[in-house]
Amino acid sequence: MRYANSQKYFKTACDLMPGGVNSPARAFSSVESDPLFIKDGSGSKVYDVDDNEYIDYVASYGPLILGHCHPQIRDALKEQIDYGTGYGSPTELENEMAELVIEAVPSIEMVRMVNSGTEATMSALRLARGYTGKNKIVKLTGCYHGHSDSLLIKAGSGVTTLGLPDSPGVPASIAENTITVPYNNLEVMEQVFNKYGDDIAGVILEPVAGNMGVVPPNEGYLEGLRELTSKYGSLLIFDEVMTGFRVSYGGAQAYYGVTPDLTCLGKVIGGGLPVGAYGGKEEIMEYIAPAGSIYQAGTLSGNPIAMRAGIETLKVLRQEGSYDQLESKSKHLAEGLAKVADKNGVSVTINRVGTMVGMYFTEGPVTDFESATSSDNDKFVKYFETMLSEGVYLAPSQFEAMFMSLVHTQEDIEKTIQIADKALSKAAQV
């Protein structure tokens, strides 16, 4: 494949934007290359500015569970634009979206719409502190919750890819109120609560850690967190920005049967547009202004364009058989990758929950940040290069998931496995 136009546009972008991108995860620095510039997407495919076609498993880093340019979403957006893009006033669409979310997510009795996952998580922390009257937040090492100061500490996603333990610019006075604990380790969590429990406002985590690849919770782990937080009067906060409506219609909490106090959403609920939400028990959410005294606001929160896209997305997903299809396709992909890895003598660990698939170049098991980062990056780089050159678009980091969509075909999956066979044979030589 040729990438001349992508390289040209990236060179220009580097003079205009820090690192040439508007989000670090999009840079190809960890795979020693320049990023693709995409001009078009349709169904399960994307097309770059050099007219190369790719089977897409990035899915805009998760939101596009219906694929690119889904006709129902496209037509709804075209219709909505004729009525206006925003009013700064409440709309019936916000009610409809809220009803769909509340109906689907077990923990949510009341919801507030925002514009991003970062807004959702930072607002949830403020609410947890205001509601409990406590100061400290516990987060899990390798879990990424956006770029707000309180949470950009031992985070995953691009922070892990770039090898940054945290970020300059986060004041020590803020960092000292964030306690980090290894993922999947209840013993250490209990020790932290024994020491700081009287001042812990909440524990926030990705119930499936999707920003250090795909790391599911050990059996009993989420239940243990639920019991521990309840014992100390702290809130359990699930960051389901990635897992919400992706691992099941009710998210990871429905999948695992553990109900948090607060839930953060994003990605899928916007149908590809910028959106976020946080919600939970009514008695907690009523602390948010104007019902209560904890302030949070947004000029574009609940805007009709994002609401319309989200509504149409959820209507498609709740149709009978949608998640059966997604499960079948995702299982086929994961099992196929494992088979060709074994064929080529490459030690990999493949973790999957619902439509999220993660592959690590390590014998595993991968259960936390330490084991995730033991993956062989040199092997991943060779694998990534071959997959890309043969027409499969993966995130340029081994710490991002592959995302399945409803529009990926069996042909797409079989072709992906065939190309992975070739890519793994090359990775085996590294």
Curated annotation (Swiss-Prot):
It comes from the Bacteria. It comes from Natranaerobius thermophilus (strain ATCC BAA-1301 / DSM 18059 / JW/NM-WN-LF). This is Glutamate-1-semialdehyde 2,1-aminomutase. Its EC number is 5.4.3.8. Belongs to the class-III pyridoxal-phosphate-dependent aminotransferase family. HemL subfamily. GO terms for cellular component: cytoplasm. Homodimer. Pathway: Porphyrin-containing compound metabolism; protoporphyrin-IX biosynthesis; 5-aminolevulinate from L-glutamyl-tRNA(Glu): step 2/2. InterPro entries: 4pyrrol_synth_GluAld_NH2Trfase, Aminotrans_3, Aminotrans_3_PPA_site, PyrdxlP-dep_Trfase, PyrdxlP-dep_Trfase_major, PyrdxlP-dep_Trfase_small. The gene is hemL.
